[in-house]
Amino acid sequence: MRGIAKSIVLILLILAGTLAYFLYPPEPRAVTFPGGKRFAFSIVDDTDMATLERVKPLYELLHRYGFRTTKTVWVLESNEPSHPPNRGDTLQDPAYRAFILDLKKRGFEIALHGVRGGSSQRQDIIDGLKEFNGILGEYPKIHINHSLNRDNVYWGELRWSFAPFQWGYGLIGKHKFFGQDSASAHFWGDLVKQHVRYVNQFTYGDINLLTINPSMPYRLSDKPYVNYWFPTADGDNLDWFDELLRPENLDRLEREGGVCLVYTHMGAGSFNKDGGPHPRFEARLKDLASRNGWFAPASEILDYLREQPGWTPDLSFREEVRLEILFLWNAILRGLLPAPIHS
């Protein structure tokens, strides 16, 4: 029994040492922002379930407080509307299209969430990208994979680079994704490489993404169709958004000279109340706007970070594993902990 106990202790010590090695924080990166600003902030708004009625008041509020953020859109109508996250307005709707064009005119960034809510084959993707370009005058700089779309690039088990995580997800994951598979009817990896600059990979619970990934944005050698990946901070719904941007976190973001790109679903309903923006949403924006922050679209911030001294886009193996462990840990916490409770 003593021999077994010693073996268990030894294994635990080895595991602890290995975990400590991968989780040891990388060298911090100091960044100076335009105009003497103390930190950078944006929102990356996922278009799931977004309707003109819900999102227009929210963006009016963002504009009023001086924010320029990133909003994803769908070009084509959903072909799988029975899946709730696939529902929402698209650029096929004239009023919604006019609203999106007005946002772009005001300085907001329009990004892609796949060409539709639902899986698309290559010709539809080509047509959707051309229509995006025709309407907005440019191709999207940012793409965000959507839910169960089979045309997602490097999604599911291929979202991971560390082999044990990839294998583990492959065993439990029920869905496959083919956007990077040149033999698939859903392939468009070459178009991502040609037209899209940034793709979101993982989301974290930390407000300052530079502490998670100092070299953001980054490249991954095993995912060649994506030019650059970037992390986001978890503000999925109003409760998590409110929790992430509480005053003490904003104090820290400002103190550390950090970067926060909040990933959220502004059109899903939680940000609205009585036909307008929820008061808690406005309170967080008001606090943010009172601080010396650089409020710019996500791709503008990422472009700027690439130009700063000390940027190293190619992650080491250790950094890759660290990002994946931290993402897994955040996902576990989100699953185990109750949502924040607010009055």
Q: Where are the predicted features?
A:
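Catalytic alpha-helical scaffold of carbohydrate-active enzymes acting on polysaccharides/glycoconjugates
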Residues: R2-I11, G17-K223, F241-V262, F271-S343
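Surface-exposed cleft-lining segments at the edges of enzyme active sites
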Residues: Y225-L238, M266-K273
